């Protein structure tokens, strides 16, 4: 099968979050499964700086962006058997960052038009075209409404993956003519209109042949008013083509037996290296070096979406216990200040590292006993899977991908891979935390068994790839 991905970011070239991880890993797994895979990404200035000498020029042409003609260069490189094509236009993509400009609508309108017109020119007409989030969600609409006259594109099947429904691409309806060069008919009849705006995500949901999300629970949640971001009715209407597939993690990169960022390696049969990493981390962040105290890790953006309003409200209670917490992350200044204040009040119990450090993050995943992740909503989440890979048990709020990946501790069977609570409140966070502390202190054999189950969980991309192939084969025989 010929499969083409079109996305706004993709590791290792450009990455701001989970979308970049998916684009970096899923195509590689599909190639290993015997398929021909290509990816189209914007050619950002950070790509030029880091990978420019590995990328070759292929061709260039002009793209009509409304009444304007814009330069489009095509560049190319091959990595892990995947052919990466880049759309080059310095005016749109040399901004020093991926997102956040006032003209993001125009930037990604150009990108989508250029990606579609590039397919013929690079001679890669896919059987299946996989687009991601609102930045590329107009492509299924454009294929059926603007480029339907191109015979080579007639049989292309499309899949839209929603990584985060919060970001929908809502713009003035004038964009349809001014940038995309199409009429207002589909806006006037309500197909593309939502809240009196052009809504790219709605267009993708309606026009794509299949819609996927990054976990089964999130697929169900976005059909409710609580998580649907005002598109829940549209998703309910299209529910027959909506499904969820849990993201994977790179099992080779996140491997406690070989991780180059760790001082000591270990496996599920011998955790002595984990204990040494714990002592090393305690020393590094200025906490008393104690093997007996439970060490709790947090690696996250410090935002309300991640549940840190509830964590801050609970901290006084939690820190009355004989525990240590090491936090790594940046975000809302109010949360940054709160954690810094608590670190001063409880210097031997809380280390607040208001920054981001890849090596320190890896050490936290590997060295801690518990990993706290009480997200208000979480489409998939990767941190909890990374933590389990290293035998660090997650304590999570039961939403989205957290519900799908963390098996809550069952005290009757002594089974599970972590701890979870259903109601996001300080009371239930504290109650679940006490359950975990009791198990750690009084039932070490059961704790050890949970660690083993967590480390044996399969979150590899090869497993996720099989689910995506089932989805693709439902469209392409």
Swiss-Prot record:
* Top-rank taxon: Bacteria
Q: Which gene name belongs to this protein?
A: glgA
Q: Which InterPro entries match?
A: Glyco_trans_1, GS/SS, Starch_synth_cat_dom
- GO terms classed as biological process: glycogen biosynthetic process
Signal peptide stretch: none
Q: Which family does it belong to?
A: Belongs to the glycosyltransferase 1 family. Bacterial/plant glycogen synthase subfamily.
Q: Where, in this chain's numbering, is ADP-alpha-D-glucose bound?
A: 15
Describe the function of this protein: Synthesizes alpha-1,4-glucan chains using ADP-glucose.
Quote the EC number. 2.4.1.21
Q: Which PANTHER family match?
A: ALPHA AMYLASE DOMAIN-CONTAINING PROTEIN (PTHR45825:SF11), GRANULE-BOUND STARCH SYNTHASE 1, CHLOROPLASTIC/AMYLOPLASTIC (PTHR45825)
Q: Which organism is it from?
A: Streptococcus pneumoniae (strain ATCC 700669 / Spain 23F-1)
Is Glycosyltransferase there in the keyword field? yes
Supply the alphabetized keyword list. Answer: Glycogen biosynthesis, Glycosyltransferase, Transferase
**Which GO molecular-function terms appear in the entry?**
alpha-1,4-glucan glucosyltransferase (ADP-glucose donor) activity; alpha-1,4-glucan glucosyltransferase (UDP-glucose donor) activity
Q: In which pathway does it act?
A: Glycan biosynthesis; glycogen biosynthesis
Protein name stated in the entry: Glycogen synthase
Q: Which reaction does it catalyse?
A: [(1->4)-alpha-D-glucosyl](n) + ADP-alpha-D-glucose = [(1->4)-alpha-D-glucosyl](n+1) + ADP + H(+)
């Amino acid at each position: 099968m010929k499969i083409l991905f079109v996305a706004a970011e993709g590791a290792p070239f450009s990455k701001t979050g989970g979308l970049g991880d998916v684009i970096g890993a899923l195509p590689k797994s599909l190639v290993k499964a015997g398929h021909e895979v290509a990816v189209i990404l914007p050619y950002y200035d950070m790509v030029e700086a880091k990978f420019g000498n590995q990328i070759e020029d292929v061709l260039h042409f002009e793209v009509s962006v409304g009444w304007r003609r814009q330069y489009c260069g095509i560049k190319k490189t091959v990595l892990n058997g995947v052919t990466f094509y880049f759309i080059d236009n310095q005016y749109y993509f040399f901004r020093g960052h991926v997102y956040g400009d006032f003209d993001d609508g125009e930037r990604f309108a150009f990108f989508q038009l250029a990606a579609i017109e590039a397919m013929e020119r690079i001679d890669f007409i896919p059987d299946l075209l996989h687009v991601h989030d609102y930045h590329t969600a107009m492509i299924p609409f454009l294929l059926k409404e603007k480029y339907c006259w191109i015979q080579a594109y007639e049989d292309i099947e499309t899949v839209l993956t929603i990584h985060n429904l919060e970001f929908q691409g809502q713009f003035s309806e004038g964009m349809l003519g001014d940038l995309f060069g199409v009429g207002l008919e589909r806006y006037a009849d309500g197909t593309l209109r939502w809240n009196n705006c052009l809504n790219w995500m709605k267009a993708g949901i309606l026009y794509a042949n299949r819609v996927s999300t990054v976990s089964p629970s999130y697929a169900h949640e976005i059909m409710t008013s609580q998580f649907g971001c005002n598109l829940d009715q549209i998703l309910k209407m299209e529910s027959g083509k909506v499904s969820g597939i849990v993201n994977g993690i790179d099992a080779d990169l996140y491997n406690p037996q070989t991780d180059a960022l760790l001082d000591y390696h270990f496996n599920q049969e011998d955790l002595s290296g984990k204990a040494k990493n714990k002592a090393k981390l305690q020393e590094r962040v200025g906490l008393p070096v104690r093997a007996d105290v439970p060490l709790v890790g947090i690696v996250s953006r410090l935002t309300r979406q991640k549940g840190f309003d509830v964590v801050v409200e609970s901290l006084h209670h939690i820190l009355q216990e004989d525990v240590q917490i090491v936090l790594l992350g940046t975000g809302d200044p109010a949360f940054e200040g709160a954690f810094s204040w608590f670190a001063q009040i409880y210097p031997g119990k809380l280390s607040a590292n208001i920054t981001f450090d890849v090596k320190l993050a890896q050490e936290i995943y590997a060295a801690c006993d518990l990993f706290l992740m009480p997200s208000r909503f979480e489409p998939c989440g990767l941190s909890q899977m990374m933590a389990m890979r290293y035998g660090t048990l997650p304590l999570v709020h039961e939403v989205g991908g957290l519900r799908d990946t963390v098996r809550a501790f069952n005290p009757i069977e002594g089974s599970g891979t972590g701890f979870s609570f259903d109601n996001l409140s300080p009371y239930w966070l504290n109650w679940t935390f006490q359950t975990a502390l009791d198990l750690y202190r009084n039932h070490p054999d059961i704790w050890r068994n949970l660690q083993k189950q967590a480390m044996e969980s399969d979150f590899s991309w090869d497993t996720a790839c099989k689910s995506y192939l089932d989805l693709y084969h439902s469209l392409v025989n």
